[in-house]
Amino acid sequence: MYRNILRKLKRQINTILKIYIFIKKHEHHLRKLFVIFQVIISIVLLSLSVTTNDHDHLFDSWYYFASHLILSLFGIFVFFKKSTNSKLLYLYVILLSGLLITASFSFFWYSGELNIIENTCISDQCNHDRAYYRKKTYKIIALIVVEGVALHPNLSWLIQVLKKERKLKQLNTINNTNDTAIRSPSLNNISGNNNNNINNNNINNSNNNINNTSYNNDYFNNHNIINNNKNNIYNNNNKINSELQPPSILNKNSKPIE
């Protein structure tokens, strides 16, 4: 029992995956087919609204279906000629989503009117109104299905185009930075030479400072040695002179040498 259920689930999952893979492979062609189908449905609904003279509601009149036809023709132009233009795709998706919102609003409007008639009116006099609002709801349901089916692949394609444009912008910025770096090697050499000259000047200045400090230290040391030698010579001369002078001159109270 459980094995049969699991087998059925596997088969269903496999079929869903096959359909998904098929849609992904032929996504661009299916998108074009959806747009063509949208044009056909809008022409049919427009012709029905014109023949039946539906002028009772803004969202279910002939000019609403005419605007839908114009938008579907614009979608054919976009997908067959400008399929990589993100701005036109963005405009088409916004307009199509606006029509989908108005169609859903009109569906709730007419379905509400139909429920009111079915719940309040029991006599045969309301059969005409009942049939009228039923036709309206069926047309709006068909339009909502077509617009919803057409909106999803268009939105996914718009997202893909925007991602590709972002990647291209990033690659262009990287290439521009690389080109500027390649085209201006002289600036790099000049900056490198300036840095080398600055470093060499700093090294030379430091060496000169070291040499100057060592020279000054040697000079002061030699000068001190010379002064010390002069002082020693002066002291020795004083001693010699004091020994050579007579005692009377040295000291008046000193006795003469016998």
From Swiss-Prot:
Regions that span the bilayer: 33-53, 59-79, 88-108, 140-160
Task: Give UniProt keywords alphabetically.
Answer: Membrane, Transmembrane, Transmembrane helix
- The cysteines joined by S-S bonds are none
| Topology versus the membrane | Multi-pass membrane protein
| Region ranges (Disordered) | 237-258
The main place the protein resides is membrane
Give me the stretches of Polar residues compositional bias.
242-258
Subcellular location as annotated:
Membrane
Q: Which domain of life is it from?
A: Eukaryota
List the GO terms this entry assigns under cellular component, sorted alphabetically.
membrane
Protein name per UniProt? Uncharacterized transmembrane protein DDB_G0276999
The scientific name of the source species is Dictyostelium discoideum (Social amoeba)
Organismal lineage: Eukaryota, Amoebozoa, Evosea, Eumycetozoa, Dictyostelia
